[in-house]
């Protein structure tokens, strides 16, 4: 598998209407894809995309099967 095509864990942090910080985790190739996935799978983020305040790439471990 090409290193550029590997999926990495991303955490998408966002604030709800009460300003409470929440997060969703996704495996994606880059931060933009993680944002797109968050908008697809989280109704609140889809309706309020500017509620995202951080997208962080978490540490990941290569696993060979």
At which residue positions do the language-model features occur?
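Short intrinsically disordered terminal tails
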Residues: 1-6, 61-65
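Short aromatic-glycine-(Arg/Gly/Cys) micro-motifs in beta-strand/loop hairpins
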Residues: 2-22
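Generic detector of low-complexity/intrinsically disordered segments
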Residues: 8-9, 24, 39, 56
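A short, exposed loop/beta-hairpin motif centered on an aromatic-Gly-Thr core
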Residues: 20-33
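Short, mixed-charge low-complexity intrinsically disordered segments
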Residues: 39-65
